[in-house]
Regions:
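Residue-level signal for inorganic ion chemistry
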Residues: 42, 76, 155, 225, ...
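Asp-based, Mg2+/Mn2+-dependent phosphohydrolase catalytic module
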Residues: 208, 227, 231-250
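Non-catalytic pre-domain segments flanking phosphatase-related domains
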Residues: 1-17, 207
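Active-site phosphate-binding/coordination module
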Residues: 30-128
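Conserved acidic, metal-coordinating active-site core of Asp-based
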Residues: 104, 108-215, 219-227, 236
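Asp-based phosphoryl-transfer active-site loop
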Residues: 11-28, 225
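Short, structured coil segments at secondary-structure junctions
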Residues: 67-68, 76, 170-174, 227-228, ...
Length: 250
């Protein structure tokens, strides 16, 4: 760690971690034995901890819950709770936009998922969908009309079109897609991101971006790396993340 980074590190008062391929291996669920020690040491130094994930709070596995983070920034910043379960911030997608999105997926011939604050449902179940979603949320139910029963905070595409897929003009000024798997993208509010969610927590605490350190690996961490005082990329990170990182783990 160079002198400049050491100086910046003295200002850190809260550390946010991504979950998949940062705290745990997404394919196997393995969590290094050193992780609980890291959280314990941060607490002993008076440094707060948080999770910043595209997952819903219902998808934060028990092993991560056991680390006792102070804050949970979930669904790419759309739903935030503290460790006591108090809601710090929430931003639902307008029902009319959800309905238009579903109509668009049918026109495109692709499948979708709908994510509430504490549950998620699938439009159908296929091998392609299972390959993408089961490592994150095993055994999700099929309910294509979930939006009629719950507020929706995030949606998914399930397809094999990759970066060739784009939202229609009528939705692209309200929603955006963030690719997280070769067969799936998160569909989130246009201003929604992990960075926006972390900023809500920082504002809630009366802190500044320079007081924040983040650990991440994926494209949905890009804005977070721009926002935080110190950004740490995992060795397995996407190249675009590594380019923005202050430090890359081995």
């Amino acid at each position: 760690m160079d002198a400049k980074l050491k100086y910046k590190a003295k200002k850190i008062k809260i550390v946010f971690f991504d979950i998949d391929d940062t705290l745990r291996t997404s394919k196997t669920g393995f969590i290094p034995a050193t992780i609980p020690t890291v959280f314990k040491q941060l607490r002993e130094k008076g440094i707060l901890t948080g999770i910043a994930s595209g997952r819903g709070i219902f998808g934060v596995v028990p092993e991560i819950q056991d680390l006792k983070p102070d804050f949970f920034v979930t669904l790419n910043g759309a739903y935030i709770e503290d460790k006591k379960g108090n809601v710090i911030y929430q931003h639902q997608i307008e029902k009319s936009d959800v309905e238009e999105y579903i109509s668009w997926t049918k026109d495109e011939g692709i499948e979708y998922g709908l994510v509430g604050s504490h549950a998620a449902k699938l439009s159908t179940r296929t091998e392609l969908i299972s390959e993408a979603i089961d490592p994150i949320y095993p055994n999700l139910d099929v309910d294509p009309d979930f939006h009629e029963k719950a507020d929706i905070y995030q949606m998914w595409t399930f397809e094999d079109e990759g970066d060739d897929l784009h939202l229609p003009d009528s939705l692209s000024d309200k929603l955006r897609m963030v690719r997280w798997h070769e067969h799936s993208s998160d569909v989130v509010p246009i201003a929604g991101s992990k960075a926006a969610g972390v900023a809500k927590v920082v504002e809630h605490l009366g802190l500044k971006p320079e007081n924040v350190m983040v650990f991440g690996d994926g494209l949905n961490d890009l804005e977070l790396f721009d926002y935080a005082g110190i950004s740490i990329a995992m060795g397995v990170s996407h190249d675009k993340i590594k380019e923005k990182a202050d430090y890359i783990t081995k």
